[in-house]
Structures are given as C-alpha cells and as structure tokens.
Regions:
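Short acidic, hydrophobic short linear motifs in intrinsically disordered regions
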Residues: 32-43
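Basic amphipathic alpha-helical segments that dock to polyanions
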Residues: 27, 40, 51-61
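Charged, low-complexity intrinsically disordered regulatory/assembly segments
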Residues: 119-204
C-alpha cells in the first residue's frame, strides 16, 4: 500500500495524517481485524508513547475501536486499508499443514486468542470468508508465526527477518501445534465456548 496523501476535500477528511498512515498500512498489509497494543508495538518497533498517541488519534477518527481484548478495525478503517476479506494471502514459509475436525474450530480458535507460546507473543487476527488467521510475533519482532484455520485444515506459516534462524520459528510452531492438539483432545471434556470475535466464521 502506498503512503496516504491528502488529495482533495473528501479525501483529506477521511485519510489519517501522514505520521499515522504507516500504522494503518501495516494493519492493511496484515489484514488485521483485531490486535493488541503490545503486539502491534513489536510489529512496528516503535516507542509505546508514540504508538499510544497514534492509536488514540485513529480511534478518535473512527478507524479503530478499543475493546477489552485490544483494538478492532472498524468498517471505516477496513475501507481505508483496502482489506479484501477474500482469503488469506500467503506471504510466509509453510512450516506445517494438517487436517482438523472442522466442528471444533470455533472453540479451539477461542482458546488460542490472546495466548503466548514460548517466544511467541499474541499479535492479533484476521478473518477470511472460510476461516480465521491468528498471528503471533516474537519480542523483538523478527519472527512472526501465523495459524491459518479454514473449515478442515490448519496451516502454520512463518515469516522471518534476514539473519534469523528458521529453526527458531519451527520450534515455536511446534509449541503452538502442541497446544492446539491439547485443545482438540479436551473438546469432549469442556463446555463449548466461542470467543465473540470468532462468531460467524465457523459453523459449530
């Protein structure tokens, strides 16, 4: 996505200031529908106070809304970022792919959202027509791992900055998959709960 420039009266009323556009650009590139402050800070690598001011301005302009679980991108924000909502766009290395029982996906996704795994810290999620993508990032922001849930498949992708060891992403993905397996194993023992952000995505 190109930097946002104010071109006309209507556009200038809609577009955020140039100093905020990089945040919206990353949100658009990641197709984020929801995220946490700390996750986005790691992704961007900027100071907490700077990000706090930017998010406050974007919230005031109705591009974002703050919730008890972090931030969600509003319809206005998705329009600005050009979020297609047509499906996950592959941009990483496939670390693992497996078939899953689709009827439990909503509950498992709910159990994963917001959790940390080894070096992975929760970043946020995106929604697609046939599922959801959950995203984690390391403390320094150099490794990102995405768990892509469709109706009957889980794909784990890794994105690694130059100079990072692929084995670290592989090890982190195995920790994540181990927890996912336990959630599926516990599916017959726990009452069903679906996180509000995953409702309407999976039919359970």
């Amino acid at each position: 996505m190109e930097p946002i420039h104010e071109g006309g009266e209507a556009e200038s009323q809609f577009a955020p200031a140039d100093r905020d556009s990089s945040v919206m650009r990353v949100i658009g590139e990641e197709d984020l529908h929801g995220f946490t402050f700390e996750g986005l800070k790691r992704k961007l690598g900027i100071h907490s106070e700077t990000l706090s001011r930017i998010l406050a301005r974007l919230e005031d302009q109705d591009f974002l809304a703050k919730t008890e679980n972090g931030y969600v991108v509003t319809d206005r924000g998705r329009y600005l970022t050009g979020t297609s909502r047509t499906g996950h766009q592959t941009s990483g290395i496939v670390l693992l792919s497996t078939l899953l029982p689709a009827y439990q996906n909503g509950r498992v996704v709910s159990g994963l959202m917001g959790r940390w795994f080894g070096p992975l810290r929760w970043l946020g999620y995106s929604k697609e027509e046939d599922g959801m993508t959950l995203k984690w990032i390391t403390e320094g922001g150099r490794i990102q791992v995405d768990a892509i849930f469709s109706q009957e498949e889980l794909v784990i992708e890794g994105r690694i900055m130059d100079g990072e060891d692929l084995s670290a992403a592989v090890a982190a993905s195995h920790q994540l998959v181990g927890y996912i397996s336990r959630l599926y194993d516990q599916g017959h023992q726990r009452p069903h709960y679906q996180h509000p952000d995953s409702q309407g995505v999976f039919d359970n």
